[in-house]
Regions:
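Short basic helix-loop element that most often maps to the first helix and adjoining turn
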Residues: 15-32
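DNA major-groove recognition helix of helix-turn-helix/homeodomain DNA-binding modules
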Residues: 36, 55-70, 76
Length: 209
């Protein structure tokens, strides 16, 4: 497994979400109502005391008009400038990947060296028993997803269909279809995951609970 980026504090995800909410003049209770979770959960996430689930994070990002680059903590404009001048701008080193830790131990490592508004290129890790969201709270958003499982076994539900993906298996689907990921068996799972055009429909509905 890759190392955590020591220059990036993933625990500040909640701080970034709170700043975005306050900048937009949305109350904590109103944001919670829109997302469909309790105000106390939003408060705990903003204080970095609780990691959001994948579905809740997506719902918050959508409601706040953010991008995943905002969540990872960098801006596309400055990163594009750096990409033109940095000799190492094309490479994301294992020890300097940006990381987001989510509920139930799910972990995202960004595989692009800098932010890209059109593509989310991730190494996703699911410990034993982990899930992207509860069974009754599937997530939807704009874009299209592609996944390739490298280790362990992932369950993937898309709409009413469920798939079991072991090492070497891959999947592609429209992200607007309700979907969910979880670990199957007694081994952690990890995969390369790509989302293209998630921000294409910023008002896509997430069914987070």
């Amino acid at each position: 497994m890759a190392s955590t980026d020591r220059s990036f504090d993933g625990s500040k995800v909640g701080t970034r979400l709170r700043s975005a909410r306050e900048d937009r003049g949305i109350s904590l209770r109103e944001l919670a109502r829109r997302v469909g979770v309790s105000p106390s959960l939003v408060s705990q996430i903003e204080l970095d005391r609780v990691n959001p689930s994948v579905s809740t994070l997506y719902a918050l990002v959508i409601e706040l008009g953010m991008t995943m680059s905002d969540v990872f903590g960098d801006g596309p404009a400055t990163q594009l400038i750096r990409a033109r001048s940095d000799d190492d701008s094309l490479v994301a080193r294992a020890e300097t990947r940006r990381v987001i830790n989510l509920a139930s131990g799910v972990r995202w490592e960004r595989l692009t060296p800098h932010s890209d508004p059109d593509v989310e290129f991730l190494h996703v890790m699911y410990p034993i028993g982990a899930e992207s969201c509860p069974e009754d709270a599937l997530v939807t958003h704009g874009g299209r997803e592609y996944g390739y499982v490298m280790g362990g076994t992932l369950g993937v539900r898309v709409g009413f269909d469920e798939y079991e993906l072991g090492p070497g298996s891959s999947i592609a689907f429209d992200s607007s279809s309700p979907h969910r990921l979880w670990t199957i068996g007694d081994q952690p799972a990890h995969a390369v995951w790509v989302v293209i055009g998630r921000a294409a429909d910023p008002r896509a509905v997430s069914t987070a609970r």
